[in-house]
Amino acid sequence: MEKAKQVTWRLLAAGVCLLTVSSVARADSLDEQRSRYAQIKQAWDNRQMDVVEQMMPGLKDYPLYPYLEYRQITDDLMNQPAVTVTNFVRANPTLPPARTLQSRFVNELARREDWRGLLAFSPEKPGTTEAQCNYYYAKWNTGQSEEAWQGAKELWLTGKSQPNACDKLFSVWRASGKQDPLAYLERIRLAMKAGNTGLVTVLAGQMPADYQTIASAIISLANNPNTVLTFARTTGATDFTRQMAAVAFASVARQDAENARLMIPSLAQAQQLNEDQIQELRDIVAWRLMGNDVTDEQAKWRDDAIMRSQSTSLIERRVRMALGTGDRRGLNTWLARLPMEAKEKDEWRYWQADLLLERGREAEAKEILHQLMQQRGFYPMVAAQRIGEEYELKIDKAPQNVDSALTQGPEMARVRELMYWNLDNTARSEWANLVKSKSKTEQAQLARYAFNNQWWDLSVQATIAGKLWDHLEERFPLAYNDLFKRYTSGKEIPQSYAMAIARQESAWNPKVKSPVGASGLMQIMPGTATHTVKMFSIPGYSSPGQLLDPETNINIGTSYLQYVYQQFGNNRIFSSAAYNAGPGRVRTWLGNSAGRIDAVAFVESIPFSETRGYVKNVLAYDAYYRYFMGDKPTLMSATEWGRRY
């Protein structure tokens, strides 16, 4: 379909210059509208603006016409009158780019220095930070100083570097004498906490002359956190200096936990810390003493610190450490240390039942496990497998017939056309706005409508937006079923497993790109793609852009998954963790556990929360997909369940 559309696009473009006036008449059919839309887009890309202007009036009834209008306005935003932009935004209140256009035009009016026009166009605070800075600067320019200073303060108090457009607002605020030096200290604290050393240095250098002593100390501390003890001893003890010292101390602990541990008494004395503040420092160091390389003395100190801690996440980390080393006594100790609310989590209820089974208290344990089985997800399935019972999936059925009123309207019409043109990311923006505006019942119908139209990613997105967790068919559609069947055929990886990986990685959005460069359905990095193509002699791949094509992505992704699956003896726990965190880390974790623990303990003891959640999800998703493919939804194979880790 994709290639056919590209060929059609080229053929249509070839005839653009041959258009006659009669051919510009309004298109009657959707196919004709699509044809004209393609011609206009091609003409626009070729800068044939006379053709664009000639053809656009004939497409006013086409659902994607507002996108053409948007491009027309933004291509010449520097010369647009405010009334044109205002009318467009008002006429298209649900169009995603119209929502960003307001902020863009605020910035344009600021460039023109039309301050009154800016406030007339945007009487309310705009959305983006840059536009807000221009908005409050306009307030100052029109004599509304108090509102300007209030806005400046709100925009100032962040640890991030703000856009250049904010500089002039901050400058007039400072010149007015309304900027309290304490505002500098507060922003320095936020920047220090965010690790923005450059901003800390700039801000400290701008402080008034009578603050130069503390400013110099701040700059030294930001550039070299190891001077924290000197900072603590040479500055007066205030809430600000304590907070700065704590941030620097955390940096020291990341580099040298033992040095930080030994520093705590001196730091506490110099900054007059109370017990809660001292415990915060202990917690910071305790997090860094969870490895296998700690001494007995460090381990005792760590456990003493955690025993006094109020940090639930730190205590949970200690529970997982006990699980990872097969320390049953420690497991019991640290589970008991958890607060009641945390004990109600699925994972800790399961491990409490596990301890009860070990003590022969089978009835109590099974009661907990049966209660868990009433829920959905990883641990409810684990509970069923633990007591040898079948896990019953709870599936809510969405209405097969969708209310026609939901499928009408400009938003749905735009979604249909965007999906036709394979503009998935833009369609997702439209869809998100549409789904968010509906009731839960309507969201279920929209999920079903997307499912019926094979808009797999939109089906999933609707279930997430509506928290429709038991609508499993719409949450886990058999997307790209034929492609997965073809590219897992002859491989050892089950089709359901490959689909579970893709569902976890992309939620079935074929055009998604991660911030680090992973692309497409199975979120493949360009380097991984190149290596896999070479290793498996996959023909036809030449550039990372091809990873956005579903077939190419599935071909390469299933090949790489097969590679890691075979590396780890066809064990999905290992290969899933390796797909997410890398094979090297999985081997390290296996070396640490050294065959002392079972499968569930290994999963729960994975130190990276993202990877731990990833493995749990993939195993559960695999079970769902096996169910929809006609198999039993067992979480783990007998081999995976029975081996030691």
Swiss-Prot record:
One cellular-component annotation, GO: membrane
Family: Belongs to the transglycosylase Slt family.
Signal peptide range: 1-27
Origin species: Escherichia coli (strain K12)
Native organism taxonomy: Bacteria, Pseudomonadati, Pseudomonadota, Gammaproteobacteria, Enterobacterales
Protein name per UniProt: Soluble lytic murein transglycosylase
Domain of life: Bacteria
UniProt xrefs under InterPro entries: Lysozyme-like_dom_sf, Lytic_TGlycoase_superhlx_L_sf, Lytic_TGlycosylase_superhlx_L, Lytic_TGlycosylase_superhlx_U, Transglyc_AS, Transglycosylase_SLT_dom_1
Xref: Pfam families: SLT, SLT_L
Location(s), subcellular: Periplasm
GO BP field: cell wall organization; peptidoglycan catabolic process
Active site annotation, chain numbering: 505
The protein's role, per its UniProt record: Murein-degrading enzyme. Catalyzes the cleavage of the glycosidic bonds between N-acetylmuramic acid and N-acetylglucosamine residues in peptidoglycan. May play a role in recycling of muropeptides during cell elongation and/or cell division.
EC number(s) from the headed UniProt entry: 4.2.2.n1
Annotated S-S bridges: 133-166
Catalytic activity: Exolytic cleavage of the (1->4)-beta-glycosidic linkage between N-acetylmuramic acid (MurNAc) and N-acetylglucosamine (GlcNAc) residues in peptidoglycan, from either the reducing or the non-reducing ends of the peptidoglycan chains, with concomitant formation of a 1,6-anhydrobond in the MurNAc residue
GO MF terms, alphabetically ordered: hydrolase activity, hydrolyzing O-glycosyl compounds; lytic endotransglycosylase activity; peptidoglycan lytic transglycosylase activity
Gene for this chain: slt
Keywords: Cell wall biogenesis/degradation, Disulfide bond, Lyase, Periplasm, Signal
